[in-house]
Amino acid sequence: MNIPPELTFEVLVRLPLKSLARFRSMCKEWKLVIDSEFFRDCFMSHNSSSVSWSIIQTRPHKLTLEIVGHHGCKTWGLTRSPGSLVSFFAETTIRKLQVLACTDGLVLLYVESCVGTPMYYVGNPLFQEWFRIPLRPKYTSQNVEKLRNHERFSDSGLVTKMQSGIVVSYKVVWLIAHTFAQVDFAIYSSNTGEWEIKNVTCLHSAYWFSHHKSIALNGILHWLSNLTGSFLAYDFYGGHHDACSIIYFPDNGKDYELPRFRRTITTSEGSIVYFNEFGGNANRKVRVWRLVKYTDGPEAWQLFWEASLASVTKLGIDYFPVVMHPLKSEIIYLWSRNKKGMVLFNLRTHVFSLHKESEDERKCMDGCTLSFNWCNEYMETVHRYFSPSFQGGPNLLLASQYVLPRWLSRLPRPQPSN
């Protein structure tokens, strides 16, 4: 029986990506429909805000960094959390594996063979596509080991270029910060399959160390530094810039209230976001700013939420901020130590929900199912960082988000040279 093309389209566009990936490989006609730009645009318009994602930790180096997973969302239709699907099959026996970065559905790995050979891989774990990144020319295993032990070297940079929701290229970034306002970037491009070196001015390079993790967004890497009032950024797809941007937090300066928690950054709805608590006792408020311009002036930030935390404080005040929801900017995530659970707080309605690791998995505010993976243990190791007695220390990125793509993005690969 021949099925009309219009009916085929209507059926396929309502299926989750997990099913589309399977049907795409079963039938040539279905593959042609699914691969069309029109189908992709229709699918993404129907699934604009329901994507599986994870909260990942930034300290221990394990293959699965996920501490909180969101699955059962409409777009992918996963029955397990995204972190449980990440696996890597090495081409040789290995003795060490580290997850260096996760962004836009791609993962950057550092691997050591049983004889100590260093290897870097970029992959799409959902499709089990992995590509080994060649080392820089003339670099030996000893060179890489020496660099990785340098206190101002970092090999954890991964940025992407997106078009219509699809990753079309990526760059792996190594950096070494010098003491005199200079940073060297070594950049591997999936477009060229080659490395390039950039020497960039960075006035705060003396306060930049290898343990500082970055957040990638729109081709830009963002780093917190030992200077608590600001952070650094560099655009790897935005042209030939010879200097890093320095962005000061919006509550920095003597004219502002002292925030309760140490400053950090997160992402939501395509923007860098900063939120913190202000006030005290019965007047606790959360303020949320969105970064709108990469400059060092007050016009860099837009205050877009200010909400009372009176309802949350009924659980006690022993909590601290974790991340914002990456797709819904009205939802923030807080960890409650006394309740040993994740608090999801809606800034618009002031409604909150408490989710505990000891409870059965259940739906949360975005319609996804919440699952935990040693979250309580991790939060216990980092909670002291948020204590007022630590306010004089550096800012650190302790949690980030890993969001699955909204479409079937394959892993970009360098074109073979003629």
Curated annotation (Swiss-Prot):
One Pfam family of this chain: F-box
Source species, domain of life: Eukaryota
Segments crossing the lipid bilayer: none
CDD domains linked: F-box_AtFBW1-like (cd22157)
Domain F-box: 1-42
Coiled coil: none
Name of the protein in question: Putative F-box protein At3g23950
Lineage: Eukaryota, Viridiplantae, Streptophyta, Embryophyta, Tracheophyta
